[in-house]
Amino acid sequence: MCGIVGVVGNRNATDILMQGLEKLEYRGYDSAGIFVANANQTNLIKSVGRIADLRAKIGIDVAGSTGIGHTRWATHGQSTEDNAHPHTSQTGRFVLVHNGVIENYLHIKTEFLAGHDFKGQTDTEIAVHLIGKFVEEDKLSVLEAFKKALSIIEGSYAFALMDSQATDTIYVAKNKSPLLIGLGEGYNMVCSDAMAMIRETSEFMEIHDKELVILTKDKVTVTDYDGKELIRDSYTAELDLSDIGKGTYPFYMLKEIDEQPTVMRQLISTYADETGNVQVDPAIITSIQEADRLYILAAGTSYHAGFATKNMLEQLTDTPVELGVASEWGYHMPLLSKKPMFILLSQSGETADSRQVLVKANAMGIPSLTVTNVPGSTLSRESTYTMLIHAGPEIAVASTKAYTAQIAALAFLAKAVGEANGKQEALDFNLVHELSLVAQSIEATLSEKDLVAEKVQALLATTRNAFYIGRGNDYYVAMEAALKLKEISYIQCEGFAAGELKHGTISLIEEDTPVIALISSSQLVASHTRGNIQEVAARGAHVLTVVEEGLDREGDDIIVNKVHPFLAPIAMVIPTQLIAYYASLQRGLDVDKPRNLAKAVTVE
């Protein structure tokens, strides 16, 4: 949610900021702005809407070598230019961009800023006014004013601050919100995400919570809030420019759907050797063996991926698995087993709700494993162990390849633990072979895109509501499929356990109500789900079937190649991703950037 970019040094700041903001569009936003300065002039430009709207307002005379930029997703105050970042202090001297939520902003406003005039309703404007007050009224230095403000502010934040009277420096601080420093020759940068600056540098430095950074063109100084200087090593980001471009695709989502066979094969090469033996960190295996219960904590699509792996993990590891919504567990952690282990699923590794749970787990001494797509992310740094899903950058807001990669990665983990326990079922599970078949199944489904588009046009062209139904793992896939459809097509859609239809949901079925039925796993499951299909069809529902090969009948709509039952959720979800994509496309919507949504939810 939101994005920050900043640069100081021998570069064209306007170009770098705008390119960086464009790379952060996937995070979600409703307004944007930049502040650019040099020794002779400063320019502050803000706009509601897309980055293209901001670019249209920037004149050729907006130039400078230092600047900060921001994409905003409204939390405090509506989406207006006054509420868009960057924000300025009372006199306009100080300029600030901010990601996060300042929890005590009203207290700060009444306690410290009586008589100040505010242009908008944001918590960020309160922060920059506070810094300005400490400098211009209380006569503190800029650095001391920033530190004092940080000692008062409560909540989550990533700040980038500039002084229009000394434009060769950017001041940075963070707490519970992601921020990176990009390193260059004769210039340095700050950004929320390495993708924003990968065109300019591949060298980055992590900063931790409650650390302050002073950026000049030739130096990066990191201190704690008491002023003690800290040493930070840099790392090279393993990103390729081709990975973050759309290429010939109209939307990132379609590109990322198409990349899933490659992701499956990448996971095979990462977690298996040439002979097919699974390779997972032995310390992770030992930790799971010592646990008496695994708790999977996640949000959104990652939560659904957890459900899709629950049965597999339990069967192969002989360890009970419990699922939890991270946003709920952060406030109320239920009674735990005697030897719990937490597994946190997060594409970005920055999900604020999951981090809140992790902080509690660490305080309780509970071992944790983060399964993520982003090395060096907050969750990966703060958890006991990390397992990467190697899906490559996922830019479309609606997650596709991260979901399937999480399931595949956890399959390697489950098999590794089962083998270590001597479980025969795990020893017999030829995961490399089976996952190769999954990749082929995905490719077969992707070759039928025209068929899916045709089915979607007939089923969902004008509807406002739809339902997915399934049993067992198909129910878990139905939950994810419904989320995907509602996210990007704005069709109200719910995924239900097929057996629950008679317990209330069937009252919503009327003439031409779209119902998409998922059928895999066994003849018994297929028989019962087909009974539910007859029930909704008798009430006028328009039914579309997605059926695993071998369970299909004449008249079924989409046939999916048969794969191992543990991996069936990967194969079965692919048609539903395409259904969501074409439903959005046919309605003329922005597939990659659905309204009101952010890719990485970095505030609670």
Curated annotation (Swiss-Prot):
What's the main place this protein lives?
cytoplasm
Q: Which GO terms describe its biological process?
A: carbohydrate metabolic process; fructose 6-phosphate metabolic process; protein N-linked glycosylation; UDP-N-acetylglucosamine metabolic process
Quote the NCBIfam families the UniProt record gives: glmS, PRK00331.1
Which UniProt keyword terms apply here? Answer: Aminotransferase, Cytoplasm, Glutamine amidotransferase, Repeat, Transferase
Q: How does it assemble?
A: Homodimer.
What is the superkingdom listed in this entry's lineage?
Answer: Bacteria
Q: Outline what the protein does.
A: Catalyzes the first step in hexosamine metabolism, converting fructose-6P into glucosamine-6P using glutamine as a nitrogen source.
Protein location? Cytoplasm
Q: Which residues form the SIS domain?
A: 284-423, 456-594
Q: What is the protein name given in its UniProt record?
A: Glutamine--fructose-6-phosphate aminotransferase [isomerizing]
In the Enzyme Commission scheme, what number(s) does this protein have? 2.6.1.16
What InterPro entries does UniProt report for this protein, alphabetically? Answer: GATase_2_dom, GFAT, GFAT_N, GlmS/AgaS_SIS, GlmS/FrlB_SIS, Ntn_hydrolases_N, SIS_dom, SIS_dom_sf
Q: Which reaction is the catalytic activity of this chain?
A: D-fructose 6-phosphate + L-glutamine = D-glucosamine 6-phosphate + L-glutamate
Q: Which Pfam families match?
A: GATase_6, SIS
Which residue spans adopt a coiled-coil conformation according to this UniProt entry?
A: none
**Molecular functions per Gene Ontology:** carbohydrate derivative binding; glutamine-fructose-6-phosphate transaminase (isomerizing) activity
Listed GO CC annotations = cytosol
Q: Which residues form the active site?
A: 2 (nucleophile), 599 (for fru-6p isomerization activity)
- What residues does the Glutamine amidotransferase type-2 domain cover? 2-218
